[in-house]
UniProtKB/Swiss-Prot annotation:
Pfam families: A2M, A2M_BRD, MG2. It comes from the Bacteria. One of its GO terms (molecular function) is endopeptidase inhibitor activity. Residues 1-38 form the signal peptide. Gene3D superfamilies: 2.60.40.1930, Immunoglobulins (2.60.40.10). It comes from Escherichia coli (strain K12). This is Putative alpha-2-macroglobulin homolog.
Length: 1367
């Protein structure tokens, strides 16, 4: 009993006199107890209010007025919680009727879980008074016992036994479990009762329902899982309240003789109200469409029981309905857009698979769609194409301009160190992002193909599988004497839910798993028989003597294959007793001929067979019974050659219970035809709702009153035939739907009407089918529509067919992309499936399970070839003329293979098409080097090459030339690969050439440059000399190599020379990689044309080095020197981030601002232990990157002030070498501290902060930095005080190749803004073997390509004296 808040109402019914009497009795009993000092040992109450327990209460269906309403209660009946509830004795149930159901439902936030606040009473005084009365009575009797002696009491009870008390006063009190909740006053109470929870018969599944193999036996009847009957109720809305102890749950029960069937689409809702028992249309129902927060719209159903409401559909919405009899129903609708009409961009690449370093060509074609069939040109606008690698890292962005007519195209080159895997293209266009993909792998294409030819088209179980493998080179020649290894695995087939499933793969033992191909390239194949329908997976690995093997896997299906004949009829259904003509035709030339036909009726498995006329093409069958039939054609051996399903209508034909069968007479319709639909119900039906659906309910009709968009014919009690005229607006497809309800159940079925969409016919034709490498290929393209020529925009690619053997085409067919079969955008639901529930205790949320990802393996097939060209031609934009013609040419690459030409096109009306053709490149004799091209001095190369011959035992002559000497070898080649050793004695660098002659004609020729390098480690040196007209002595070391001349006459040329020297530095760790990115970014910014060949080269180098930095990153994007394990260094991490930021800014790779904030994470952790110079440099980079660093700058300034550097430290003479690194070697020296002080002054000035360092200390630091010989110190002083191009040139002249790359890169980057744009001075051509070379920075140099080391450098007399840098 709660005496504070929830007081029992019982005490208001007790009179004051009665209360006083209780108090007097209590006082007397206490007095008596004290006087008598009697033994008051009475049992304690042991009373506790029944707590009850958690349970579920739900209404899992609605009810009609003639049905007994009931709710389901689920209590825990198999554990300790049951005993906590059993004490209560059952469940208290109250049933209320809701007076205004629509207003009540509108007030609920969750219609599934009705919330009605309880009126809690607690346990009350009833059991308390019972215990007090029993206790007081017992104590008073004890007092009376002590009043008389024991002998007196015995004498009295012997005389009058009825006065004997016995054990009455020690018996426990009898308590009554009262309902702890008072009735709800707001709603009329219909009935209340206590239902025996644990004695009631538990809910159990229907007879015959059993789950085989269920160890938990969870569908067996469980105590506490019961239905509580509520009796038959009048139509309306009822509230059910169930209580066990202090636990209470509520739910609502819908009673209505009307069912609401709804179809919701993007902006519309169609509601059909029908009788729950007979399914007839019921008009006059009030409908409210709500999203759970408010009513969106409302209406009343018309005479046909339908109502259309217009509003944008939310993801979840509800229909609240009230029929004319007062019945209430609720339907829940879920909607999501499955078809969205907006801009469609078709993004595809020239091929699906690339190597690292390859060029990727991208084409974009687009249309703005307004519905499934109608579109308009896209809006011309700029777009940005982003490339993401397999790790999700953003590699680069490319600007693409999309044109309304021609679309857009772009290209980029993959980094040389690109990771393998799937890459994603993201195109940002008009605030939307579109995606495509391609793959990158380190592959070599197979140099011959392996084909499988089986002895039979179909194999049965128990039959040995025989056939042959055929090995062919790309030009069609057989692979002789190839070593072949076979491996076989088998998977049994089974059918589950009409889907083909495969069991595990198990190896099968083979006899003769290793064999050799014959002269025709054939390998006999004999596999063991399968005892059950199976799939054989045969792995073949073959080698023709080349360095790499070719591996492929072939699939063989046992008792499941493709048909040899097509079997068709005029319609896919007919009437019983009607003669049906079936026609058959061969799909391919075969000796197998059908001799018999057989049909099987699926309903009763009856069958019939008959013979086919010899040489016939058709046969006639008269089906006497309605039903579903399977027809098959068999040959003389009983092998199935063709199959077809056919439906027969007639009296007695029914669908399966709960379903509707719809059979269309054709699979594809042309506009103007009539689609015939056979509708079969499971029982006699008089009323249903027929609709055409796609983006909305396009048309609707009742079965009893057909609308004008269709005609209906009733064939029998359960079958109807609907005829729907097909219009152009149906394309590419539309859904025909049938919906009905009966006896409290509803069913619907959809059937698609597929309509042909006109497509462009694009044909590709070459002037011949076979070409030799280097020949000119002429291609003719033809575009037509319905047989008439039409102008169109085409994109054509010529790709090695072997690429598609490694990676099938990723881009979808252009016709299926722009005009796919649309998904039905209408969702159907009913008020019969709405469930309301309540739970006494909410469950704890469960953490979601972790995702499981697996990586896809990359195929690694090998193919030796001379020229690695995978895309022979790429024409992103070709236009056919009014006659539908276009032409282009390309040179056949130096590769022997089969090429695929793919042409995709679109005309001005948005109609698309795709065509394909094939051609071959072949050559009887061709050569390929089999030796490296770089050697060390002293090596003795074993020179050789491969000659691939398509002839056998034909004499040829091999002529090789090197260093002026010519060698001739007469050879007899066998078919295939022939290795030939060369007889030249090669000991020096030079050009090696080879020529293959036959009958005096040159059949093939190749050449390569061989280089010999010194064994010692090369050290780059440079010097500046003054050169003039005439001879100039160079005085170079004897072992000098890679000699280059560059003009250094102007500051701009000095800057370019240093930039090029940094770019040419060998990459390696984080320092060098970042030091290459800085000058590359400067070179990119200096270019006037970012689309030139030079720009593409610089972009490629930036991509390679950015990716190199990504690969060096450790955990948390922190860096060590070489990417090794360990905690990241804050300075190296900041340098890597800064270099990447410079490169990203240069080439337009955008990142979110918070992305760069990670640069300062490691600095914040390690700043206290870092040298002042390192700290100053990191904050200088951070300030340049616009990162928030004012607080960090204050901390650095305070650290410099606390350092307390002595004045004599600044006055010490700096004797270090100019090539010593201040940053890497002595970052804590006095000079380094001075440079940090000066740099910090500059940073504070930019941030508008005041320094706490004493002015005299700052002046000493400035003087020490200015008087040093370190270029970094001079650069920092120049940044602090300002400068010009002349001062910049003086600093840059002091940069040498021996200095650290980070200091040179920083000087270049910080001094770039002082360089004015001036044209470079042209250095004329020197006399001798000098070759001009274009440099990354925009300048040029002269490189020595002759033998030995030049002693003098000669120019014309007219050359005025110039400063020249020799490296």
């Amino acid at each position: 009993m709660d005496t504070q808040r929830f007081q029992s109402q019982f005490h208001w019914h007790l009179s004051f006199k009665f209360s006083g009497a209780i108090a007097a009795c209590l006082s007397l009993s206490l007095v008596g107890t004290g006087l008598a000092n009697a033994d008051d040992s009475l049992p304690s109450s042991n009373y506790a209010p029944p707590a009850g327990g958690t349970f579920f209460l739900l209404a899992d269906s609605s009810f009609s007025s003639s049905e007994e309403a009931k709710v389901r209660l689920e209590a825990p009946g198999r554990d300790y919680r049951r005993y906590q509830m059993e004490e209560y004795g059952g469940v208290d149930v109250r049933l209320y009727r809701i007076p205004d159901p629509m207003a009540f439902l509108r007030q609920q936030k969750n219609l599934h879980r009705i919330v009605v606040q309880p009126q809690y009473l607690g346990d009350g005084l009833n059991n308390t008074l019972t215990w007090l009365w029993d206790n007081w009575y017992g104590k008073s009797r004890r007092v009376m016992q002590r009043t008389f002696s024991s002998q007196s009491r015995q004498n009295v009870t012997q005389a009058l036994p009825e006065l004997q008390l016995g054990n009455a006063i020690i018996k426990p009190s009898r308590y009554v479990q009262n309902n702890q909740f008072s009735p709800l006053k707001k709603y009329p109470l219909v009935k209340q009762f206590r239902y025996p929870l644990w004695q009631a018969k538990p809910f159990e599944p229907q007879q015959g329902v059993k789950l085989e193999g269920a160890s938990s036996n969870f569908i067996s009847p469980q105590p506490g899982n019961i239905y509580i009957p509520l009796g038959q109720q009048e139509p309306g809305l009822y509230l059910v309240e169930a209580m066990v102890g202090g636990y209470r749950a509520t739910t609502v029960v819908f009673v209505s003789d009307t069912v609401a069937l709804s179809k919701v689409s993007g902006k519309e809702l169609l509601v059909w109200t029908a009788g729950k028992k007979q399914g007839e249309a019921k008009p006059g129902s009030e409908i409210l469409w709500t999203d759970g927060l408010g009513v969106m719209t409302r209406g009343v159903t018309d005479d046909s029981g339908t109502l259309q409401l217009q509003h944008i559909s939310p993801e979840r919405s509800y229909i609240l309905g009230k029929d004319a009899e007062g019945g209430v129903f609720v339907s829940e609708n879920f909607f999501y857009e499955s078809e969205i009409y907006n801009t469609r961009l078709y993004i595809f690449t020239d091929r699906p698979l690339y190597r690292a370093g390859d060029r990727v060509d991208v084409k974009v074609i687009g249309r703005e769609f307004h519905d499934p069939l109608h579109s308009s040109p896209i809006v011309s606008a700029p777009a940005k194409l982003s490339v993401l690698d397999a790790n999700g890292s953003l590699l680069q962005t490319v600007n693409v301009t999309l044109d309304a007519r021609n679309g857009g195209q772009g290209s980029f080159r993959l980094p040389e160190n690109a990771v393998a895997g799937g890459y994603e293209l993201r195109l940002a266009y008009r605030n939307q992002v579109y995606s495509s993909s391609f793959r990158v792998a380190n592959y070599i294409k197979p140099h011959f193909e392996i084909g499988l030819a089986l002895a039979k088209k179909e194999f049965k179980t128990g039959e040995a599988v025989s056939g042959k493998l055929q090995l062919l080179y790309p030009d069609g020649e057989p692979v002789k004497n190839a070593r072949v290894q076979l491996s076989l695995r088998a998977q049994q087939l089974s059918m589950v839910g009409n889907d083909l499933r495969y069991a595990g793969r198990f190896p099968v033992s083979l006899e003769g798993s290793e064999t050799v191909s014959d002269a025709s390239g054939h390998v006999a194949l004999n596999l063991p028989a399968a005892d059950k329908p199976s799939r054989y997976l045969l792995t073949v690995s073959a080698s023709d003597g080349a360095a790499y093997r070719v591996t492929t896997t072939k699939e063989i299906l046992i008792e499941r294959g493709l048909a040899h004949y097509s079997l068709s009829t005029a319609a896919q259904y007919s009437n019983s007793g009607e003669s049906v003509v079936f026609r058959y035709a061969a799909l391919e030339s075969s000796k197998q001929v059908p001799v018999t036909y057989e049909w099987l009726r699926l309903e009763d498995r009856t069958s019939h067979s008959g013979e086919l006329p010899s040489g016939g093409k058709s046969f006639t069958v008269n089906f006497a019974k309605p039903g579903n039939y399977n027809l098959t054609l068999r040959d003389k051996d009983g092998l199935i050659l063709a199959g077809l399903s056919h439906a027969v209508s007639g009296k007695g034909s029914t669908a399966h219970t709960g379903t509707v069968d719809i059979v269309a007479d054709k699979t594809l319709y042309q506009p103007g035809e009539t689609a015939k639909m056979l509708i079969t119900f499971p029982e006699p039906i008089d009323e249903a709702l027929l609709t055409l659906e796609r983006d909305r309910v396009e048309q609707q009709s009742l079965l009893s009153h057909p609308a004008n968009w269709l005609t209906l014919q009733r064939l029998n009690d359960t079958q109807y035939e609907a005829r729907v005229p097909v219009s152009n607006s149906f394309a590419p497809n539309i859904t025909f739907s049938v919906l009905y309800t009966r006896n409290g159940q509803y069913s619907f079925q959809n059937a698609g009407i597929k309509v042909a969409v006109p497509q462009l016919d694009i044909r590709v034709k070459t002037d011949k089918t076979h070409y030799q490498p280097g020949e000119l290929v002429n291609v003719e393209l033809t575009s037509s529509l319905k047989g008439k020529p039409v102008s169109a925009q085409l994109t054509v690619g010529v790709v090695d067919e072997m690429i598609y053997a490694l990676q099938p085409e990723i881009a979808p067919n252009i016709g299926k992309f722009f005009y796919p079969l649309g998904r039905n955008n209408v969702r159907t639901s009913s008020s019969l499936s709405f469930i309301s529930y309540d739970q006494a205790l909410s469950s704890e949320p469960v953490a979601p399970g972790a995702t499981n990802r697996s990586e896809r393996r990359v195929k690694m097939l090998e193919r030796p070839r001379r020229e690695e060209v995978d895309t022979a031609a790429w024409m992103p934009s070709l236009t056919t003329d009014k006659q539908g013609k276009a032409y282009f040419t390309f040179l056949m690459p130096d590769s022997l293979t089969r090429w695929r030409i793919t042409a995709r096109g679109m005309n001005g009306d948005g109609l698309v098409g795709q065509g394909r053709a094939y051609l071959r490149s072949e050559k009887n004799l061709y050569m390929k080097w089999s030796m490296p091209t770089v050697y060390r001095v002293g090596d003795k190369p074993a020179a050789g090459l491969f000659i691939f011959s398509q002839q056998d035992n034909e004499p040829v002559a091999l002529v090789t030339k090197f260093a002026g000497a010519e060698m001739r070898q007469t050879l007899t080649l066998h078919k295939g690969a022939n290795y030939i050793s060369l007889t030249q004695n090669i000991q020096q660098s030079g050009l090696l050439s080879a020529e293959l002659q036959q009958n005096g004609q040159v059949q093939d020729s190749i050449s390569t440059k061989l280089s010999f390098v010194d064994n010692s480690w090369p050290v780059e040196q440079q010097k500046n000399v003054m050169l003039g007209g005439g001879d100039n002595a160079l005085m170079l070391p004897e072992q000098a190599s890679n000699i280059r001349l560059q003009s250094s006459e102007t500051p701009q040329e000095i800057f370019r020379n240093n930039l090029d020297a940094l770019v040419d530095e060998p990459w390696g760790g984080v320092i060098n990689t970042g030091s290459r990115l800085i000058p590359l970014s400067l070179a990119w910014r200096s270019l006037a044309d970012h689309q030139s060949a030079a720009a593409n080269d610089i972009r490629q180098m930036i991509q390679d080095n950015r990716l190199r930095l990504m690969q060096l990153a450790g955990p948390g994007a922190r860096f060590t020197w070489w990417g090794e394990d360990g905690n990241g260094d804050a300075f190296l991490t900041a340098w890597a981030w800064y270099a990447d930021w410079q490169a990203s800014q240069a080439i337009g790779v955008t990142q979110q601002p918070e992305y760069w904030q990670h640069m300062l994470d490691s600095y914040a952790e390690q700043a206290d232990n870092m040298p002042l110079l390192h700290r100053a440099l990191v904050l200088a980079w951070a300030q340049e990157m616009n990162l928030p660093c004012k607080t960090l700058l204050k901390g650095l300034d305070e650290a410099i002030a606390r350092r307390g550097t002595k004045t004599e430290d600044f006055s010490e003479e700096d004797t270090r070498d100019i090539n010593d690194s201040l940053i890497l070697d002595t970052p804590e020296s006095p000079l380094a501290d001075a440079v940090a002080n000066v740099l910090t002054m500059t940073l504070l000035k930019k941030a508008q902060l005041k320094s706490t360092v004493m002015p005299q200390v700052q002046q000493y630091a400035w003087d020490k930095a200015a008087n040093s010989n370190q270029p970094l110190a001079h650069t920092v002083v120049l940044l602090n005080s300002g400068g010009d191009a002349t001062q910049t040139a003086a600093i840059l002249s002091g940069l040498t190749a021996e200095q650290s790359t980070i200091e040179r890169a920083l000087a270049m980057n910080w001094l770039a803004k002082y360089m004015a744009t001036m044209p470079p001075v042209v250095l004329p051509a020197p006399a001798g073997a000098w070759a001009k070379h274009k440099l990354t920075g925009g300048g040029e140099d002269w490189r020595w390509v002759g033998q030995g080391v030049p002693d003098i450098l000669s120019f014309g007399d007219e050359l005025s004296p110039q400063n020249v840098q020799v490296r």
